[in-house]
Amino acid sequence: MLIPKRTKYRKQHRPVRSGMSKGGNEINFGDFGIQSLAPAYVTNRQIEAARIAMTRYIKRGGRVWITIFPDRPLTKHPLGARMGSGKGAPEFWIANVRPGRVMFEIGGVSEDVAKEALRRAIDKLPMKCRIIAREGGDI
């Protein structure tokens, strides 16, 4: 699981989800990638599930890069707790993903294999995404 080694504060405010992504909008490492089309909070478990789906499909060929990191804690009160009594305990870690952000990249495999591996990863993510290529844009 992806979590920060240490943070300055245990609890944080929820990040703003509006607006387009200001950086990380292009493919830097691989040949193909997944680009988000809607804002969402992606949890560390969702990132891990997408990574496993891709790596199991490509088997030993190719390489996968994860370009987002869950650096924000999301807090939650226990089920059945009454309102009030402060902010809840940190429940899980999220990455704030805005539209246009490239989240995963894949390289070293053919276009057909990359397309299917990325499609399987998209099924694990909570927002609408598209598959893009380094030189051609949308596939």
UniProtKB/Swiss-Prot annotation:
Superkingdom, natural source: Bacteria
Statement: the UniProt record of this protein carries the keyword Secreted: no
Record GO cellular component, one term: cytosolic large ribosomal subunit
S-S bonds: none
Keywords annotated in UniProt: Ribonucleoprotein, Ribosomal protein, RNA-binding, rRNA-binding, tRNA-binding
Residue numbers spanned by region Disordered: 1-22
Entry's Gene Ontology molecular function annotations: rRNA binding; structural constituent of ribosome; tRNA binding
Segments of skewed composition (Basic residues): 1-16
InterPro entries tied to this protein: Ribosomal_uL16, Ribosomal_uL16_bact-type, Ribosomal_uL16_CS, Ribosomal_uL16_dom, Ribosomal_uL16_sf
Any one GO BP annotation for this protein: translation
HAMAP family noted in UniProt: Ribosomal_uL16
NCBIfam families with a match to the protein in the record: rplP_bact (TIGR01164)
Family: Belongs to the universal ribosomal protein uL16 family.
Task performed by this protein: Binds 23S rRNA and is also seen to make contacts with the A and possibly P site tRNAs.
Protein name: Large ribosomal subunit protein uL16
Phylogenetic classification of the source organism: Bacteria, Bacillati, Actinomycetota, Actinomycetes, Bifidobacteriales
